[in-house]
């Protein structure tokens, strides 16, 4: 806990989110913008709110987020992971419900690198028999 803020770091793909939560009326600010302005897609907004709705804390916390790297989906996943960790920092009894829903575990999938002699990570050059 930092002052009266609870903190959690979230990661997904190449995105990293630093999440601060404190008691409030449900305002979520991402990189200085309201969440609806920052995340254009409804699915991204839904992903971010999942841990709050699961624990019935959607309107009880003000959340401040700094997120860098990645794209929209990766950043939304990183924010969700960070909110989950901040909620656990606030109340450790929430951990079992959040882990059962799969929000505590970091999604370790990363982009596979392109290999030399291939078009993409696994796509080989076309083989010609003759």
Swiss-Prot record:
Query: What PROSITE patterns is this protein classified in?
Result: RIBOSOMAL_S9 (PS00360)
Q: Which GO terms describe its cellular component?
A: cytosolic small ribosomal subunit
Q: Which GO terms describe its biological process?
A: translation
User: Which keywords does this chain's UniProt record carry?
Assistant: Ribonucleoprotein, Ribosomal protein
Which molecular-function annotation in GO is an example for this chain? structural constituent of ribosome
Cysteine disulfide links = none
Taxonomy, superkingdom = Bacteria
Pfam families cross-referenced by the UniProt entry: Ribosomal_S9 (PF00380)
Q: Which SUPFAM superfamilies match?
A: Ribosomal protein S5 domain 2-like (SSF54211)
NCBIfam families per the record?
A: PRK00132.1 (NF001099)
Similarity comment: Belongs to the universal ribosomal protein uS9 family.
Q: What is the recorded name of this protein?
A: Small ribosomal subunit protein uS9
